Amino acid sequence: MTNQKQTTHFGFKSVDWNEKEKKVAEVFHSVAKNYDRMNDLMSLGIHHLWKRYTIELSHVRPGQSVLDLAGGSGDLTRLLSQKVGDSGQVVLADINAAMLHVGRDRLLDEGLFKNIRYVQGNAQCLPFADNSFHCITMGFGLRNVTDKDEALQSMYRVCKPGGKLMVLEFSTPVFPGLKPVYDWYSFNILPKIGKFVANDEASYQYLAESIRMHPDQETLKAMIERVGFEDCHYHNLSGGIVALHIAYKY
């Protein structure tokens, strides 16, 4: 169990362990209705390429069960549902009710409903039976989790033997000279876009800070392996601005 008195980071701030979950919930409740538009603006649409690359490497097949954790507005779920077909199932899970509603409404509007289920749940204590999913994806959600080790343990528990974990997340730029440019953009431009488009500068300031506080590629690889996943490797995308970690449960 998590120490009730322990502190953790919320962006660059130190907060009580249990307070972070509440604060993150407030951020995503605030950004939910503008989430897709902001993603397009902030990444110049490149996030769609990162997600499609993730799906290409998933090798998900018809009839399989997939968990899209922190699935938010449903980008990965949409693509995964096409892969598993009517005989499979994708569970879109998110801790935030506002984000879950955005994803559900969006996918229903697109006529996608036969093989998608929606669950509100905490990544640290997933409400699924052991060995439930052939593949677990988590796109841009892990950095917002309070106890990442506990969440990864929970993912390992619900992953089937022979199954795969895929974590797509902002990471640490590896190209020389890219990091200062990226930092300048993140802290000077990104919050201003949030203020102009969504009238919410503070939430996007947090998002920039949360990226900087997230473990780098090698640290996250070690964390994933520590809970039992094997053969963990990662792909740096856009010079390491984003990394896709892939690991297996044997």
Curated annotation (Swiss-Prot):
- Give a single Pfam family match: Ubie_methyltran
Q: What residues does S-adenosyl-L-methionine bind to?
A: S73, D94, N122, A123
User: Molecular function (GO) terms listed?
Assistant: 2-methoxy-6-polyprenyl-1,4-benzoquinol methyltransferase activity; demethylmenaquinone methyltransferase activity
Give the keywords, sorted.
Answer: Menaquinone biosynthesis, Methyltransferase, S-adenosyl-L-methionine, Transferase, Ubiquinone biosynthesis
Q: Which SUPFAM superfamilies match?
A: S-adenosyl-L-methionine-dependent methyltransferases (SSF53335)
Note the InterPro entries from the entry: SAM-dependent_MTases_sf (IPR029063), UbiE/COQ5_MeTrFase (IPR004033), UbiE/COQ5_MeTrFase_CS (IPR023576)
> Catalyses which reaction?
a 2-demethylmenaquinol + S-adenosyl-L-methionine = a menaquinol + S-adenosyl-L-homocysteine + H(+); a 2-methoxy-6-(all-trans-polyprenyl)benzene-1,4-diol + S-adenosyl-L-methionine = a 5-methoxy-2-methyl-3-(all-trans-polyprenyl)benzene-1,4-diol + S-adenosyl-L-homocysteine + H(+)
Q: EC annotation?
A: 2.1.1.163, 2.1.1.201
GO BP terms? aerobic respiration; menaquinone biosynthetic process; methylation
Enzymatic class: transferase
Pathway(s) it belongs to = Quinol/quinone metabolism; menaquinone biosynthesis; menaquinol from 1,4-dihydroxy-2-naphthoate: step 2/2; Cofactor biosynthesis; ubiquinone biosynthesis
Q: What does this protein do?
A: Methyltransferase required for the conversion of demethylmenaquinol (DMKH2) to menaquinol (MKH2) and the conversion of 2-polyprenyl-6-methoxy-1,4-benzoquinol (DDMQH2) to 2-polyprenyl-3-methyl-6-methoxy-1,4-benzoquinol (DMQH2).
PANTHER family from the xrefs?
2-METHOXY-6-POLYPRENYL-1,4-BENZOQUINOL METHYLASE, MITOCHONDRIAL, METHYLTRANSFERASE
Family the entry assigns: Belongs to the class I-like SAM-binding methyltransferase superfamily. MenG/UbiE family.
Q: Which NCBIfam families match?
A: MenG_MenH_UbiE (TIGR01934), PRK00216.1-1 (NF001240), PRK00216.1-5 (NF001244)
- Entry protein name: Ubiquinone/menaquinone biosynthesis C-methyltransferase UbiE
Gene name per UniProt: ubiE
